[in-house]
Each structure stands twice: as C-alpha cells, then as structure tokens.
Amino acid sequence: MNKRFTRVLATSLAAASLLGTLGACSKGSASSSSEGANEITMWTHNAGNPEELKAIEDVVAAYNSSSDAKAKVKVQAFPQDSYNDSVVSAASAGNLPCIVDIDGPNVPNWAWAEYLQPLNLSTDLTSNLPSTVAKWDGETYAVGYYDVALAMMARASDLKAAGVRVATIEEPWTAAEFQDALTKLKALGKWEHPLDMGTAGTGEWLPYAYSPMLQSFGGDLVNRDGFQSADGVLNGDKAVEWAGWFRGLVDQGFMAQKSGKDSTQDFLNNKSAILYTGSWAADKAKAALGDDLVVMPTVDLGNGPKIGGASWQWGVTSGCENAEAAMDYLSYSLKPENLAAVAKATGTIPATNDAAALIPAFAEGGANRIFMEFSRNYAVMRPETPAYPFIATEFGKAAQDVLAGADPQGALDKAAKAIDANIKSNGGYQK
C-alpha cells in the first residue's frame, strides 16, 4: 500500500469517526475542473449559515471587482453536515478547489495528507490572535478571520444573593472557590442543578469544552513533545484527578449528567445559575439579561484558566493550478475591514486588534472585548498533530464514559492506549 493512499485512508477514517468535524482526504492532484486560468473556486461549509456566507460573498465580490484581482473567485457553499463528504469525494478524484475552509484543529491532518500547501501571503500574520493561525511542522497552512472563546456566564443578582464574588481576569475562581460558589448557589434552592456545562453535547464539543479543564489540572490530550504518546498525560495522576472532579460535579448534584439540548436557552429561562458556554452566546444573553449578566473566565483548576483555541480557517490546496491568485485573494481578505465584516456578521472575535477597533463591542472598552482577552490570555491550541481527529474522538468517548460513572483510570487508560496504537500504526504521523 503506497504512502499517500495509507494517509488518505487514515485521515478519512479519523474524519468519519469524529462527528461534526472535518476530516482529511487525499492530495488534490488538480484543481476543480470548472476552474480556468482566470477563475478559482473556493469551498465553504456555510450554506446553512446565511449571515456568514453573505459576509464571505461580499468580500469575494469586492475582490473580484478590484482591478488588481489576479483571478475571479467563485464561491461554492455546502451544508456543514455534508461538507466533509464533499471534500473527501473531491480529493479522492483529484478535483479539490483552490481554496477550502477547515476547522482549525484539523489543519495538521490535512497538511499531513499532502493536500494543503503552506501559505505564502503578503499579509503579516504576527498581529493575529495566535489561535487564528494554523501551523504544522514549522509552516503555516491556514488562517482564520475570527475565533471564539469559552467563558462562564451568570446573573450578578444570583451571585450576590449567594454571597459569591464575580470572578475576573485578574482574579479567576480557584477550584476551591468554584466548589464554594456551587455549594452556596445550590443552597438557595432555585435550581436542581446550578451549573450547566453542556453535557448533552457531542462531537468536537467534548474535547473543545472539557480538555481545557484537563489541561488546567495539569494533564493533556497527548504529550506535546513530539506528539507520539498520550500515555502519562491523558491517564496520569493529574488527568485522573480531573476525571474524578468532573464526575464529582454530577455526584454532588451541581450539574446534570446530560444537560438539556439548548443550554443557553435553559440558562436564560433560569434553569441554571452558571452557564459554561462561549462568546457566541454573549449577544443573546446580553439582550435578555442586560446589566444583570456577568461574563467570567473559566476556573483556575491549578494551572490557570484554559480554553480551546482555533475555529474555521482558510487554506490553499496542493493541487491548485493558480496558487498565486489564491494566495492573493486570501491576503486581500485579511484586511481589517474584511475581518471586521465577517466577525460582526457571526458575532465572533475578530482576528486582529485593527479589526476589533472597527466593531464597537470588541473595541477597547466594548462589551465583548473581554472575550478577546480570554482568547489572548487563556487559549490553548488543540494538539497540532495529524492525530488530532482520532485523539478528539477517543477523548470524547472517555469524557462521556466518565460522566456516565465509569472508572476514571480505566476510561482514560483505554483512550490513551487507543491513541498510542493509532499514532504507531501511522508511523508517528511524520511528514
């Protein structure tokens, strides 16, 4: 079995096992057959996201109307649920378009599969939020217009009634303070479970939401020194301590083993006192609660607050026959006004300070500026390894098992063993 086909098979299987994320596929040996010398195609997962799709189409239209455009860019949008299948099919046939979007943590997998090429942009990316720049093996393969940030939300009036202080960037809650806050809030008798951490979530939510807590305890998904083994970091003492704490939130009645389908709406309906969510919920919560809403950093569980970094990003395929034009478009799209337009349409954190300055909510002193600070201060990139889709799947299974009452050590040992076997079977995912 040749090396490229082995990589294709490994990345496609990993993708299929991780619901809700993008998987990898084969190197595109040519750009889409519909492309000509003066036209390049760009694929996006945003067919079901009209606001973001329109913002992207507006950027493309502005570029196409520019006298400096090196080619016309044609947008083709897919529903997110079918986007991965479309990419896999096109890559297998050698018909990938020139530009694709991809969920940030999966970029190394795509690069390893040899169908993304390193970016060569005229734009300086050093001022971008680090989580919006995807790298692997020392090279940059994708860049995003925005990120999102995890946080905790509560009503100031509830915290005051319970005698609990508001956590801040300067002084986040410690594990002991979090325990005390939950105990006092539960004692008010207003909620069956004062904490909602979205435990009904599936797919990428599981590693995105819960691995930062593991990291704050001192564990991790994989040893980042070479990314060759999860043994000792995913199933070591600190990781087992995290798992026991996580299940303990259920055992103590602080949170449900399986939350409702819409945790944000449940919080707004006063079914919980503290909501663990992301910046995407801020505008809706602010509109409903006004000045009673407080946004707080995640808990310092021993090694500082941690949140997951990276959202959807853009890359250029290896088979693109007009890579110069593709790179030129991406460089153009990274202008502050374009970043601001997309971030404003999606309610996300703009990738640069210059773009943030164009959005009142994210400018200095703006209501949502705190999320940008969370991202800069707390974001941890999900492991930048081609093994990530498999790692994410195995961690997700372990997290769900722990929530269901499984032995923490056993659940984490099982995940670590599977991850190590996968890495070994793929030759360490070396370039």
Please place each PLM-identified region on the residue numbering.
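A structural signal for short loop-to-beta-strand junctions that line the ligand-binding cleft
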Residues: 90, 98, 124-159, 193, ...
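Periplasmic-binding protein-like
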Residues: 55, 156, 330-353
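Long, aromatic- and glycine/proline-rich binding clefts that accommodate carbohydrate-like moieties
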Residues: 296, 344-394, 426-431
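Conserved N-terminal structural module of periplasmic/extracytoplasmic solute-binding proteins
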Residues: 2-107, 302, 324-325, 341, ...
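Extracytoplasmic "Venus flytrap"/periplasmic binding protein-like
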Residues: 62, 66-128, 135, 142, ...
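Hinge/lid segment of periplasmic solute-binding proteins
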Residues: 102-153, 206-209, 213, 294-296, ...
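Helix-loop-helix "hinge/cap" segment bordering the ligand-binding cleft or interdomain interface
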Residues: 65, 134-208, 219-258, 318, ...
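Extracytoplasmic/periplasmic substrate-binding proteins
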Residues: 45, 64, 209-212, 240-322, ...
